A protein has these predicted regions:
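Short, Lys/Arg-rich, polar N-terminal cytosolic tail immediately upstream
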Residues: 1-12
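Alpha-helical transmembrane segments of multi-pass membrane proteins
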Residues: 23-43
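Membrane-proximal soluble regions of multi-pass membrane proteins
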Residues: 149-203
Length: 238
């Protein structure tokens, strides 16, 4: 079987949809976080606040631009899925990069907000940290699948081709045609966040996967320092 067949031996569109749905939910969670942290975090009495410049609502403009860009890309991605367009991976790559940048920017906005306001409700901070963790998990779940799965398919047909991620040999030896599924990538994503590194017996091989894990671990570390620590300090002060 040639390389071309292996390259296109990817999950069907309804199987792709699980990972694409995860990627699509992430910016929606980020928008929810933005609304919570920017509208309520700076107000001890719960009044709505705005970030404005010369009368213009910059928060609303930011949310509108991000939402519009991601919605347009999502519509295009759905169209390519329905018509099985050959550029589907290119569209997913663009959407994945933008969603990741949106996640990182949102974490920076959270950090800026909690460092510049004197009083923040501890419950709100814990909620924001949980939502940010969920958004991060969904985003990097997509990246691990997007980068690794094609290499797993190539390795299935050509044993000399290296995989981007080496999964535990016990799972591979059980079935000569074993391929990782959603649960395998979800486990890898969650454990990488929880331990700030790859889980036991999971080895990142490709440079792309190593870069993804570094970005993921750094983002989680920032969340721990900026959000959780501030929430714990607020609880002690109450």
């Amino acid at each position: 079987m040639n390389n071309r067949l292996a390259l296109h031996h990817l999950p069907k569109w309804h199987q792709n949809a699980a990972y694409i749905t995860a990627l699509g939910i992430s910016p929606l969670i980020n928008l929810l976080i933005t609304g919570l942290i920017w509208k309520r975090a700076g107000s001890p009495h719960g009044e709505w606040t705005r970030w404005s410049f010369n009368g213009y609502d910059l928060e609303g403009l930011f949310v509108f631009l991000v939402s519009s860009a991601l919605v347009l890309l999502s519509i295009n991605l759905v169209r390519t899925l329905l018509y099985k367009h050959q550029r589907i991976r290119g569209t997913m790559l663009v959407l994945g990069v933008l969603v990741t940048l949106d996640l990182i920017l949102n974490v920076l906005l959270i950090g800026y907000r909690i460092c510049t306001v004197p009083t923040i409700d501890a419950t709100l901070l814990l909620l924001v940290s949980a939502l940010a963790y969920l958004s991060l998990t969904l985003t990097f779940l997509f990246w691990y699948w997007f980068i690794d799965y094609p290499t797993q398919v190539r390795h299935l047909h050509h044993q000399d081709h290296l995989c981007a991620i080496v999964f535990p040999r016990e799972a591979v030896l059980m079935d000569a045609r074993w391929l990782p599924n959603l649960l395998d990538y979800l486990y890898l994503t969650v454990m990488t966040s929880n331990t700030l590194g790859p889980p036991e017996n999971h080895t990142p091989v490709s440079r792309s996967i190593k870069l993804v894990q570094m970005v993921q671990s750094t983002t989680v570390l920032v969340l721990l320092v900026l959000v959780v620590s501030r929430a714990v300090n607020t609880l002690h002060q109450q």
